[in-house]
Amino acid sequence: MPQTKRNGFAEYKTQHIQNAIFFDLDKNSKKDSSLPHMLVEVDDWEKIVSKMGIKKNDEIVIYDNSDVISSCRCWFNFIFFGHDPKLIHVLNGGLKKWIEEKRKVTNIINKIEVSNYKAHPQKKLVKNKISIDQNIEEKRFEVIDARSKERFEGKVSEPRKGLRSGSIKNSY
């Protein structure tokens, strides 16, 4: 993620869990959006996942080297594009905990056999700005803000330019 000023691929090349495949959240997000890490188009997702060699019935464990921010976003991408939720997991504690527990890591990058992944977007999982605006006026669903308490309360600046601080009305 850009605001961390880290290079995920460089970190992956240095050490990762054996047989792990690198997923670049920045590169694999919508390019023509002013908002960060928006979902790509279906055909783009199919190309991304096919190049990773992942098949529709593969069980997937996702981890990252942060506070699970990237892995949760990656997890949601797979769920949104129709991968069976029972087959998608986030590694508890991520790479940090894995290493703290003195588990094996490697710098070997395996050769990937390209697959032919077919996505089935679950569009009902995403709400747009219009839905949120309507919910502010007439509450129909819960809105949960997963940012830090300080960001939710507007006590600290947003890490990305152009985003206002504070919460959306009717959010928790």
Model-derived regions: residue spans:
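Cytosolic catalytic domains that perform sulfur/thiol-centered chemistry
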Residues: 1-172
